[in-house]
Every structure is written in structure tokens, then in C-alpha cells.
Amino acid sequence: MNLHEYQAKQLFADYGLPVPSGIPCSSADEAVAATKKLGGDKWVVKCQVHAGGRGKAGGVKVAGSEQEVRAFADQWLGKRLVTYQTDANGQPVNTILVETCGNIAKELYLGAVIDRSSRRVVFMASTEGGMDIETVAHNTPELIHKAALDPLTGPQPYQARELGFKLGLNAEQLKQFTKIFLGLGKMFVACDLSLLEINPLVITGEGNLLCLDGKINIDSNALYRQPKLKAWNDETQEDPREVEAARWDLNYVALDGNIGCMVNGAGLAMGTMDIIKHHGGFPANFLDVGGGATKERVTEAFKLILSDSKVKAVLVNIFGGIVRCDLIADGVIGAVAEVGVKVPVVVRLEGNNADLGSKKLAESGLNIIAATSLTDAAEQVVKAAEAVA
């Protein structure tokens, strides 16, 4: 689960990190009122969306008057912001953040991720703040400095000092950086984060450190024990189909193709998409119904696939282990009958109760194409999609 910038900064503040004074606003009047409350004669206004690249897309502006703030709010609120990290439709802008504007002497980078190979939280710091960290890692990896946290002891002051020295901080800034580092380390574990970034972490004209931006990803599997953070989830930033899939514990990711896929198991789902591509087709989605699929979940999965108007054919690929193929067949039959499917459906069933499942499909009277193998299924569904198109 992603947080907006203003939410990330609120969490930073809860852990004692220095952040600019700012007010999230959902209307132009609120934005103008925020400038009065914040004071000063210059403000930074930012569109709040779950995507990077806002500045280059016009979603961040330094405003020197209340009129400019109002114009920015009128321009973006209720609209969609398209960046290099969004699709062509962009993300809806429901909130803008109005912040005080200060002097920046230098931009740094500070972030943390879970390193799967070492099974530790790893902090990364760089003097190349304000840039895409992936680009820095590719072009100049020597400029990224790392510190791995021991899960038994957590973040240590000496690790902060080592990173701070490499960033060229002075004695006072080292104290501030240590406080930020220790706070982030505690927050990362306590809030079940999977990623955090402060880009840039700036040195102000007065020589102090300030978290000028914030990006936080939370482990969705841990939301059951993070009720406060779960309440911050903005579903408008997500694909409505993916939101609906989550309600049924389905793993769904929308893609740009025209062949819908329903598979049990993430590995088999990826393999299914690969073989569709291999035979000249284009998957419309990734959808894993999981090992504990029920008739109801399969029905909802089928309805979810067919809600995409681009879908011209559907491939159901089930290898029955825990999942019984006859239950999958019941779900397919129920969905086809309920939704009124008008596109070809290719079904490949193998494993637990596959014969019974195939028998149910054959006796259903529905226009379902039975496949004898995965290769046959891919060839048939690509051919069917091309015929409809």
C-alpha cells in the first residue's frame, strides 16, 4: 500500500523527523486559506498522487502569490496527472499539498528497502539527491552508500555517523542525521514498511536537514495490524478492478492486452502469460485465484476479467492440486451464465478432479473450447482473440 506525500510526512513528524510546515487541501479556497495560515510570501504547491515524476509533469509549482496558488488548485483538483510512472490515463488529483518554501543549499538522498538476499533492512544514502536513484545506481553506483540493520539490535548511531561522514555532513548536521536515521529505522519496522524514500533530504540555507519529500510503501500483508495506516489508503489511486479483486483475495494486475487470464498459482500465471506472448497474443491481465479458490471467488474472478472491454477471449488454466478442477468448472459455468459471456472461453484443466471438471463443462451446453495441453490452450485462445478482433 502506498501513502501520499503529505501522509508520509505526517508519519515522519510522528517519529521526530524535521519536515516543512504544510497543509493538505481539497479545494482552491482551502489552498488559499492554507497560505494565510502558513504565512510567508512564497509557497510550494504539489499534486498528491501515487506516482513520481510530478515536477516534470507540471504537478509541482513554486507560487509567489495567493492567486497563483488558487490557479494551481483550479488547474489540477479534480483532474488527472500523467507522469512517466503512470499509464496514459494518469492518476486523479483529489488533494494538493501547500507548503512553506525555504532556501536549499544541497540535496541528498536517503532511503531504505528490504534486501531479500541478506534478509535485512538496508539504508541507502547518496549525495545525488533530487535525482532518480535507479539512474544513479546504474551510472554511478559508487555514489550510493549502504548500511544494513541487524534485526536484533536495530539501527545504530555509528551507522548513521558512517553514512553522514560519506555525505560530507558537519558535526551539527551529523547529530541531526543520526536522529533522522534512528527514527526512520524504528519507523520502518514498527509500521511494517517495505520501502521508504526521502528524495531530496535537503540541507537548508541555514545548514539544517529537512525532509523535503517523502515516499512510503507499506507491506499490504501486514495491514491487519496497522489499522491507522490502513485507514489512510486512497483507493482512488488504484485500478478499480484491482481494488475489487483485493476484496475477494484475488491477485490481479491489469495489463494492456486483449486475452483475459485466470490461473491458479503465481508461477503458472506468469508462465501462461509468457506462452500467450510466445504464440503472438497479448495478456489483458495477471490473475491468480490462489490455492484456496471457491466457486464464488472463481465467479468473481471471471466477472472481473470480463469487466475489461478490451478482452476478446479468455484463457482459464488450472492445475488442480489444492484447487479442485470441478469447483473451477462450476465457477466458470456460473460466471458465464450470470455475466452473459460473448467472447470465446478456452479452458485447460489438469490434476485434481480434472475429468469431472471437463465433464461438467462439456455438459453445460456453453460455448467453451476445451484444450488438451497448455500449448494447445495458448494457440486456441490467440486464434479465438484474433477472430473476434
UniProtKB/Swiss-Prot annotation:
Residues annotated as domain ATP-grasp: 9-244
Class of this enzyme: ligase
PROSITE patterns assigned: ATP_GRASP, SUCCINYL_COA_LIG_3
Binding residues for substrate: N264, G321, I322, V323
Any one GO cellular component localisation term in the record: succinate-CoA ligase complex
Single GO molecular function: succinate-CoA ligase (ADP-forming) activity
Residues annotated as binding ATP: K46, G53, R54, G55, E99, G102, E107
Swiss-Prot/TrEMBL keywords: ATP-binding, Ligase, Magnesium, Metal-binding, Nucleotide-binding, Tricarboxylic acid cycle
Reaction equation(s) it catalyzes: succinate + ATP + CoA = succinyl-CoA + ADP + phosphate; GTP + succinate + CoA = succinyl-CoA + GDP + phosphate
InterPro entries reported in the protein's UniProt record: ATP-grasp, ATP-grasp_succ-CoA_synth-type, ATP_grasp_subdomain_1, Succ-CoA_synthase_bsu_CS, SUCC_ACL_C, Succ_CoA_ligase-like_bsu, Succinyl-CoA_synth-like
Enzyme Commission numbers on file: 6.2.1.5
Assembly: Heterotetramer of two alpha and two beta subunits.
Family, similarity comment: Belongs to the succinate/malate CoA ligase beta subunit family.
PANTHER family membership: SUCCINATE--COA LIGASE [GDP-FORMING] SUBUNIT BETA, MITOCHONDRIAL, SUCCINYL-COA SYNTHETASE BETA CHAIN
Protein name as it appears in the record: Succinate--CoA ligase [ADP-forming] subunit beta
Gene that this polypeptide is encoded by: sucC
